[in-house]
């Protein structure tokens, strides 16, 4: 599969302040996650002349130029079935067609499969072929992914990491940062990181933390300057997961062992 990655400067808190747009296929290509209109992406799109436009999920730093490029290329605009209305609200344009996990989109280099990868967002999908996948905000090469309400679901996120790891890809292509050429190690690291954080959240509650802020302070031993809001969202997602699994009680404000 021919893969072109074009980093696009956006108002994102992802690594490098950019979102990766991708073009898959040397003919009848798919443009994925066109976050903004830039000269570099214009040039790449002009060379590839994509037949399809799609996104991994609807967050603003992934959809900013969807309508522009779908119109400019006269391309088929895709959205996830059952999320078409949310897609239209996020992009300002209705999809031409919808897909479901397991569906495939044809390119000149072969078919691209839609893989269900919720967690960072409910509608999140990856676009996979035999050796790789565009994975959006499921994974990053360095650091971790924010998973928090209202869109995030920690149980779903962990399942998605395991699902992708089972595919044994050679490379995966994230929404932010460099290409990941060691997918198994990276996905294992992200899983371990989340499970370790779950244990620190559980321990904080066991030791008397009750409010989200108290759990946050007890679960993290590093300086959270500039990212405290992101860490707070992640703590909420962990508390929700633990509550659903019966490990503690959490009403959205207070946790009890």
Located regions from the model:
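Conserved beta-strand hairpin/beta-sheet module of binuclear metal-dependent hydrolase folds
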Residues: 1-45, 125-141
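Core dinuclear metal-dependent hydrolase active-site scaffold
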Residues: 6, 23, 102-129
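Active-site HxH/HxHxD metal-binding segment of metal-dependent hydrolases
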Residues: 10-17, 34-108
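Divalent metal-coordination and catalytic microenvironments
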Residues: 24, 33, 57, 99, ...
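Residue-level marker for buried hydrophobic side chains located in beta-strands
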Residues: 30-32, 54, 113, 132-134, ...
């Amino acid at each position: 599969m021919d893969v072109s990655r074009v980093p696009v400067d956006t108002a994102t808190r992802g690594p490098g302040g950019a979102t990766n747009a991708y073009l898959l296929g040397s003919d009848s290509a798919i443009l994925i996650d066109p976050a903004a209109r830039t000269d570099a992406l214009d040039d790449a799109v002009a060379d590839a002349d994509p037949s399809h436009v799609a996104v991994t999920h609807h967050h603003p730093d992934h959809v900013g130029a969807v309508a522009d490029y779908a119109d400019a290329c006269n391309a088929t605009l895709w959205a996830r079935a059952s999320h078409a209305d949310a897609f239209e609200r996020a992009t300002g344009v209705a999809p031409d067609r919808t897909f479901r996990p397991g569906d495939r989109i044809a390119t000149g280099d072969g078919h691209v499969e839609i893989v269900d990868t919720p967690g960072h967002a409910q509608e999140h999908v990856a676009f996979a072929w035999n050796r790789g996948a565009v994975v959006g905000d499921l994974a990053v090469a360095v650091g971790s992914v924010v998973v928090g309400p209202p869109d995030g679901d920690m149980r779903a996120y962990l399942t998605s990491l395991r699902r992708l790891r089972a595919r044994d890809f050679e490379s995966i292509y994230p929404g932010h940062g460099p290409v990941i050429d060691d997918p198994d190690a990276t996905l294992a690291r992200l899983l371990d990181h989340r499970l370790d954080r779950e244990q620190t959240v559980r321990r904080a509650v066991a030791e008397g933390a009750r409010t989200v802020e108290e759990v946050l302070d007890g679960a993290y031993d590093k300086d959270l300057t500039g990212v405290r809001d992101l860490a707070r969202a992640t703590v909420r997602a962990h508390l929700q997961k633990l509550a659903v699994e019966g490990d503690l009680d959490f009403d959205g404000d207070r946790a009890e062992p």
